A protein has these predicted regions:
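Ferredoxin-like alpha/beta domains used as RNA- or RNAP-binding modules
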Residues: 1-107, 134-207
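Short, intrinsically disordered, mixed-charge
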Residues: 106, 121-122
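Short, well-ordered loop/turn sites that connect or cap secondary structure elements
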Residues: 119-120, 139
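Glycine- and Gly-Pro-enriched alpha-helical subdomains that act as flexible
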Residues: 123-127, 131-133
């Protein structure tokens, strides 16, 4: 499967904000955006006229990069969100939050979504006691997500549980000692703390 393999800090600089794609490094002064808070490339420092389309595109790219999706995956998810009742933009963000790799990340067991996605792919995550290896799996209310016994003994997992000071969203119940997260309810828009203006994404895809 295709995936981005370039420097992720470059993506943060392109969006002119921290997307927290490198874990602990993003909280330090070593983060490249602290030293170079402008887009990468030879014309990065130049002033660019921000058109309506550019603003819409940047919001879409920002959301896509935060959750680590390719364009086709993101567009398919948008199509599903548009087919549901309710507000399309909120539906999209809710479905992004309900991804299994995101729930593992939100629970504080992984330092980045890339790391949580790798654990799902490698079979280290169970949902209601059954192993699930699909990162895009949509969790539902009442689902219990847990790391396997083998994963719980991994040094990197224990390190994350001991050092990550992440606030677990209200729609999740986390039990760090058991590396377990329970989905209390589906997330509401006010419970999703991503810096994305979803209405601009809807406007972009509605053209």
């Amino acid at each position: 499967m295709a995936r981005y393999t370039g420097p992720v800090c470059r993506l943060c600089r392109r969006e002119k904000m921290k997307l927290f794609l490198k874990g602990a490094k993003c909280d330090t002064m070593k983060c490249p955006i602290e030293r170079r808070p402008y887009p990468p490339g030879i014309h990065g420092r130049g002033r660019i006229r921000e058109s309506e389309y550019m603003l819409q595109l940047r919001e879409k790219q920002k959301a896509r990069r935060i959750y680590g999706l390719l364009e086709k995956q993101f567009r398919n998810l948008y199509a599903q969100a548009a087919g549901q009742t309710g507000i399309t933009g909120e539906n999209l963000l809710r479905m992004l939050e309900q991804r299994l790799d995101n729930v593992v990340f939100r629970g504080g067991f992984a330092s980045t979504r890339n790391q949580s996605r790798q654990w799902v792919r490698h079979g280290h995550v169970t949902v209601n006691g059954k192993r699930v290896t699909i990162p895009s799996f949509q969790v539902r209310k009442g689902d219990v997500v847990q790391l396997s016994p083998k994963a719980r003994n991994m040094i990197v997992v224990r390190h994350n549980l001991d050092t990550l000071d992440r606030i677990v969203p209200q729609w999740l119940d986390a039990v760090p000692a058991e590396a377990q997260v329970t989905v209390r309810e589906l997330p509401l828009r006010e419970q999703i703390d991503v810096p994305v203006r979803e209405q601009l994404i809807v406007e972009l895809y509605s053209k």
